Amino acid sequence: MDLEAGSIRPRSDGEGGGPAAGRETDDSNVWKDLFLAYKTLGVVFGGLVTSPLYVYPSMNLSSPTEADYLGIYSIMFWTLTLIGVVKYVCIALNADDHGEGGTFAMYSLLCRHADIGILPSKRVYAEEDPLLHSQSAIARRPSRLGKFFEQSITARRVLLFVAVLGMCMLIGDGILTPAISVLSAIDGIRGPFPTVSKPVVEALSAAILIGLFLLQKYGTSKVSFLFSPIMAAWTFTTPIIGLYSIVHYYPGIFKAISPYYIVHFFLRNKRQGWQLLGGTVLCITGAEAMFADLGHFSKKAIQIAFLSSIYPSLVLTYAGQTAYLINNVNDFGDGFYKFVPRPVYWPMFVVATLAAIVASQSLISATFSVIKQSVVLDYFPRVKVVHTSQHKEGEVYSPEINYILMVLCVGVILGFGGGKAIGNAFGVVVIMVMLITTVLLTLVMIIIWRTPLVLAGLYFVPFFIMEGAYVSAVFTKIPEGGWLPFAVSITLAMIMFGWYYGRQRKFEYEMTNKVSLEHLGELLARPEVQRVPGLCFFYSNIQDGLTPILSHYIKNMSSLHTVTIFVTLRSLLVAKVDQSKRILINRLGPNGVYGCTVQYGYADNLSLEGGDDLAAQVTSCLQWHIQMDTDGRRSPEEEMAQLEAARLAGVVHVRGKMRFYVGEDAGWFDKIMLGFYEFLHGICRSALPVLGMPLQQRVEIGMLYKV
């Protein structure tokens, strides 16, 4: 096995199979990686590679000179090199969580290795994680920093807030990328036709986005095969135009690679130069997708695609744009279309529009995935999540989120109008996500990889200073449009925190008032309690004990089904749960009463393809458990007969619906937060429809909890 950057990776099939077998496997892997690298062009890099459409138009330049443009290009070159190549390609892609990437994947990785999750039900221990289980006891021993997080609830809450903020900013990216990409592409129509007004461009852009959002429910499988060719055409044509501009306008542009031009730029422009960082930061837009989309592609494929095509394409395209602008210093307001030669103007307009649509689709799909992960882990109110492809598990769609995104995207276009105002808002999202990644990645280095503090500091200090400078610059844009992502992120964070707080209080109440097996036996021994025919799936949120709603149910209904299975849906801070560990069954003691835990990770499909299928899977696991477990008080044949008779009598799914009753003596914080939670709980979907239970088999039992 190979140990690489803290993750363990099994040998490939060709290793150890002889020289010929090894060469065949290596050749096969090379072609597979190249094909995956080609596919990443249409999914991963859409936002990054289309950034030349709006970087220069988003800058607030005032009488720029040749020296200014050389300094700006030098800043963009080193930003792409340091953040794109060094940070993401060389370092961040190694901080995966079982192949999944992104800020929340790093958070889940930290929670497992240092046991710093907030809710006990969300923690994962060594026996549940094959990576942790395979490590030695010394490797699993927490570091000093890990112990600090374990002992400080405040530090753990801050860490959760940082991870949640990263998710909220990514959702903000899903609002702004479609708006700025499509608007910047369609704005090219005003070049040949100056009489076309900006409101017409905005209306066309809004119409395209509305059509794109309305098509989301059909999935992208039928058209996704076009994404990579479109982005490949864009990726390879823009640098060709860039080379033409370099030769034609300014052959010496690459002298700007020298950091001297950055120093000279800031010394010359001082405060204005610092403020211009709010525009240059957009050159790295979409780089976070390299890490966030790691679960859909291999690390090597993303590295190959970025280093062989995306990075050279952006370097040459920006060099060509800058070379053109040095000779046409006042054309920065339309810095992309002005540098496109007239003979290829309309073909490039078509390619740019299609590329902007593909980039928008990539961010919309990423937003759906983030929302799905949050719902699965119970950090976000339940919304409908539909899998639009039978072959691609990660292809999901949420109707509620889709229409909210559509309204916000169209509102951004019509409300902000120009790309410069949207660019101000966009810069805040871009750099905040990257700064959060830097912080979490440093924690991963120290706590998990056990990187010496000196080496971790060599990573953290330069990137924190560079990204901190960008953050300070984009914060000055808050009055000019930068407030939008903050408003969206704060709203989302309030929703997630309110939901989390209510779920935590509910969990604490259930743990305090849980029903023990002894108490269940006493309830069933009462003469008025009858065992009625049927198979009952009784859903609970706790593993150790039974939900207090059970006592409420038995006392009021005076009955319990002959076979009752208490089902706990347990979300783990892992990407995926092995199928063999998905459903766990155990006997609880009383006749016909069993416990079942359904485990899933944040990248798993929560739905088990319909209620009948869930009943069949759990029943099948229970039958196997009965046959293998010889410690029962009754014979396996007798228990099997009872289970079959109960199944034939009818299946019912029972879920408790506990509501908070906030009394007059409750504190002001509880009144606000629990009232907000009750509002969210009232408008969100029930857990049973999310699992696909048939309507006629569902029963909900209400119970009030006085605070």
From Swiss-Prot:
<feature type="topological domain" description="Extracellular">
    <location>
        <begin position="56"/>
        <end position="71"/>
    </location>
</feature>
<feature type="transmembrane region" description="Helical; Name=7">
    <location>
        <begin position="306"/>
        <end position="326"/>
    </location>
</feature>
<feature type="topological domain" description="Extracellular">
    <location>
        <begin position="327"/>
        <end position="343"/>
    </location>
</feature>
<keyword id="KW-0813">Transport</keyword>
<comment type="function">
    <text>High-affinity potassium transporter.</text>
</comment>
<feature type="transmembrane region" description="Helical; Name=8">
    <location>
        <begin position="344"/>
        <end position="364"/>
    </location>
</feature>
<dbReference type="InterPro" id="IPR053952">
    <property type="entry name" value="K_trans_C"/>
</dbReference>
<feature type="transmembrane region" description="Helical; Name=2">
    <location>
        <begin position="72"/>
        <end position="92"/>
    </location>
</feature>
<keyword id="KW-0812">Transmembrane</keyword>
<dbReference type="InterPro" id="IPR053951">
    <property type="entry name" value="K_trans_N"/>
</dbReference>
<feature type="transmembrane region" description="Helical; Name=11">
    <location>
        <begin position="455"/>
        <end position="475"/>
    </location>
</feature>
<feature type="region of interest" description="Disordered">
    <location>
        <begin position="1"/>
        <end position="25"/>
    </location>
</feature>
<keyword id="KW-0630">Potassium</keyword>
<dbReference type="Pfam" id="PF02705">
    <property type="entry name" value="K_trans"/>
</dbReference>
<feature type="topological domain" description="Cytoplasmic">
    <location>
        <begin position="1"/>
        <end position="34"/>
    </location>
</feature>
<dbReference type="GO" id="GO:0016020">
    <property type="term" value="C:membrane"/>
</dbReference>
<feature type="transmembrane region" description="Helical; Name=5">
    <location>
        <begin position="223"/>
        <end position="243"/>
    </location>
</feature>
<keyword id="KW-0325">Glycoprotein</keyword>
<feature type="topological domain" description="Cytoplasmic">
    <location>
        <begin position="502"/>
        <end position="707"/>
    </location>
</feature>
<feature type="topological domain" description="Cytoplasmic">
    <location>
        <begin position="93"/>
        <end position="157"/>
    </location>
</feature>
<feature type="topological domain" description="Cytoplasmic">
    <location>
        <begin position="298"/>
        <end position="305"/>
    </location>
</feature>
<feature type="transmembrane region" description="Helical; Name=9">
    <location>
        <begin position="403"/>
        <end position="423"/>
    </location>
</feature>
<feature type="transmembrane region" description="Helical; Name=6">
    <location>
        <begin position="277"/>
        <end position="297"/>
    </location>
</feature>
<feature type="topological domain" description="Cytoplasmic">
    <location>
        <begin position="216"/>
        <end position="222"/>
    </location>
</feature>
<keyword id="KW-0633">Potassium transport</keyword>
<feature type="transmembrane region" description="Helical; Name=12">
    <location>
        <begin position="481"/>
        <end position="501"/>
    </location>
</feature>
<feature type="topological domain" description="Extracellular">
    <location>
        <begin position="424"/>
        <end position="427"/>
    </location>
</feature>
<comment type="similarity">
    <text>Belongs to the HAK/KUP transporter (TC 2.A.72.3) family.</text>
</comment>
<dbReference type="Pfam" id="PF22776">
    <property type="entry name" value="K_trans_C"/>
</dbReference>
<keyword id="KW-0472">Membrane</keyword>
<feature type="topological domain" description="Extracellular">
    <location>
        <begin position="179"/>
        <end position="194"/>
    </location>
</feature>
<feature type="topological domain" description="Extracellular">
    <location>
        <begin position="476"/>
        <end position="480"/>
    </location>
</feature>
<feature type="topological domain" description="Cytoplasmic">
    <location>
        <begin position="365"/>
        <end position="402"/>
    </location>
</feature>
<feature type="topological domain" description="Cytoplasmic">
    <location>
        <begin position="449"/>
        <end position="454"/>
    </location>
</feature>
<keyword id="KW-0406">Ion transport</keyword>
<dbReference type="InterPro" id="IPR003855">
    <property type="entry name" value="K+_transporter"/>
</dbReference>
<feature type="transmembrane region" description="Helical; Name=10">
    <location>
        <begin position="428"/>
        <end position="448"/>
    </location>
</feature>
<dbReference type="GO" id="GO:0006813">
    <property type="term" value="P:potassium ion transport"/>
</dbReference>
<feature type="transmembrane region" description="Helical; Name=3">
    <location>
        <begin position="158"/>
        <end position="178"/>
    </location>
</feature>
<keyword id="KW-1133">Transmembrane helix</keyword>
<protein>
    <recommendedName>
        <fullName>Probable potassium transporter 17</fullName>
    </recommendedName>
</protein>
<dbReference type="GO" id="GO:0015079">
    <property type="term" value="F:potassium ion transmembrane transporter activity"/>
</dbReference>
